């Protein structure tokens, strides 16, 4: 998607980063938006995060230090016409990411364990509409989703938060617009 491809281009500008991108390449994806043809530090795995064992196998193969979870169905209007794909991708997919990453994290040795982070990229849509333009949202604002898309992302926010609180899993959530 738009944010993910921009992030990958930015991360590749640092010669130390190695990027493993799991993307099912859907309507929101454009492989040509990332110039990675000859870049040996970039690997694209064209799969859905809901594929059984994909996350665990990928993590064991590549042994990353950080996970940035941007995989999502992301258009509000599409969520109104087809909410089931949003539920499956944004809620079940996030659950699968958490399960696979948590299992991997538990297998790490102490040095890698301390360095590992799971970044979940959400949306400001989870906070609903803001009536006063002088106000803003914070991570402590109440969740008030107004569409199936926003509700599916809010559900993901809560799953990620619960893994952090319940299992001390090292999570970070950002709610971008």
For the regions a protein language model found, what residue spans apply to each?
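N-terminal Rossmann-like NAD(P)+-binding domain of SDR-like oxidoreductases, especially those catalyzing
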Residues: 1-177
